[in-house]
Regions:
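Short coil-to-beta transition motif at edge beta-strands of beta-rich domains
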Residues: 48-62
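Residues at structural and domain junctions
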Residues: 41, 58, 117-120
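Short, flexible beta-strand-to-coil junctions
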Residues: 11-15, 61-66
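Compositionally biased, charged N-terminal/linker segments
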Residues: 1-52, 102, 138-154
């Protein structure tokens, strides 16, 4: 996967937005995600500004429901605050909404990016081994989406 990074983007749906609004959107172009009001954690803002690159992978995690509902790619580099959206996701039809989401227990048990110890930031980094594990799990739980997942996950 070259130099691409893998991230988790965490949201709490109780704030009135859920990832299905992205996955079900008819948007043909890139989808603007996140603004200053939405992401307050300094570490998340720094990751987005300095490290998120176009093509990076994002696991979409809903904290209150404790599951990964899908995967998307960044359609832009991360931006600094004050420039509108902090980052754009790929058009929804290029992303994958999992038929069988990965749940916190047991699927994500040993994956640090999802543990409370990793802090409360919206955006967290997923390391190589964790990504390999997540990829295997996704394919195992969603065999009928294997082709789309392989295309997206590489």
């Amino acid at each position: 996967v070259g130099q691409l990074n893998v991230w988790v983007f965490k949201i709490n749906t109780k704030r009135g937005w859920e990832f299905d609004q992205y996955f079900r959107s008819r948007a043909r172009g890139a989808y603007e995600l996140g603004d200053e009001g939405w992401i307050r954690s300094a570490s998340s803002l720094r990751y987005i500004r300095e490290e998120v690159k176009r093509g990076d992978l994002f696991f979409c995690y809903e904290v209150d429901r404790k599951w990964v509902v899908g995967v998307a790619r960044a359609a832009s580099d991360g931006r600094d605050t004050g420039m509108g959206s902090l980052l754009d996701f790929c058009p929804p039809r290029e992303a994958v909404r999992l038929k069988n989401p990965l749940v916190r227990h047991p699927d994500l048990d040993h994956i640090l990016a999802f543990s409370p110890q990793r802090g409360r930031g919206t955006v967290q980094k997923i390391d190589r081994d964790e990504f390999a594990r997540l990829r295997r799990l996704m394919l195992r739980k969603n065999p009928e989406q294997a082709e789309a997942l392989r295309r997206l996950l590489g």
